UniProtKB/Swiss-Prot annotation:
Keywords: Ribonucleoprotein, Ribosomal protein, RNA-binding, rRNA-binding. The gene is rpsE. This is Small ribosomal subunit protein uS5. PANTHER family: MITOCHONDRIAL RIBOSOMAL PROTEIN S5. The keyword Acetylation does not apply. HAMAP family: Ribosomal_uS5_B. The lineage of its organism: Bacteria, Bacillati, Actinomycetota, Actinomycetes, Mycobacteriales.
Length: 217
């Protein structure tokens, strides 16, 4: 009788653990699927300390880049007592700071330079097949944004935080050729070479008069 009771108890525990494991696995799969929609890059993790009356209190900070690989990217900075919690906070902040990067055929629309504190980053468009020619922190931002061909160079501080924010500042300065042409009352292919030295606008944008319908020959 006791053996039967023990067997029933074991079966019930096994069934309960199987059900709980299945539910946890389902939740984990849901989280992985949601995470799979975005590219996440942890650029830097630092340990910081705070001196209090009882001694020192240690915590961790994480600089995280999140993007969809198709022109949306954001930067987040998280702080917590544990590394995973700091990364999670950084990811949440990065998703709240998403912005759109104008891209044409996998590269940026024109050369641009961004600055943040002592960080200075220069970005130039590149022809297809060039790849992402950039350093670690700059590369993380560009890859998450979905840039496939670009030339980048850091001209200022090597601090990862400054470099990342300088890269973001540069990307936020980008403009689409058709928008600039519309403001100037020009065709998209008539922009000066000084603004578009790589010829991206004239070759890959819609070439038509602004505000008028092209007369048929």
């Amino acid at each position: 009788m006791a053996a039967q009771s023990a067997g029933l108890l074991g079966d019930s525990r096994e069934g309960r653990s199987r059900r709980e494991g299945g539910s946890r696995g389902g939740r984990d799969r849901d989280r992985d699927g949601e995470k799979g929609n975005y590219l996440e890059r942890v650029v830097a993790i630092n340990r910081v300390s705070k001196v209090v009356k009882g001694g020192r209190r240690f915590s961790f900070t994480a600089l995280v880049i999140v993007g969809d690989g198709h022109g949306m990217v954001g930067v987040g900075y998280g702080k917590a007592k544990e590394v995973p919690a700091a990364i999670a906070k950084g990811v949440e902040e990065a998703r709240k700071s998403f912005f759109r990067v104008p891209l044409i055929d996998g590269t940026i629309t024109h050369p641009v330079q961004g600055e943040a504190a002592a960080g200075v980053v220069l970005l130039r468009p590149a022809s297809p097949g060039t790849g992402v020619i950039a350093g670690g922190a700059v590369r993380a931002v560009l890859e998450c944004a979905g840039v496939h061909d670009i030339l980048a160079k850091s001209l200022g501080s090597d601090n990862a935080i400054n470099v990342v924010h300088a890269t973001v500042a540069a990307l936020k300065l980008l403009q689409r050729p058709d928008e600039v042409a519309a403001r100037r009352g020009l065709r998209s292919g008539m922009l000066p070479r000084s603004w578009d030295p790589a010829g991206v606008a004239g070759e890959r944008s819609v070439d038509r008069p602004v505000g008028r319908v092209r007369e048929q020959a």
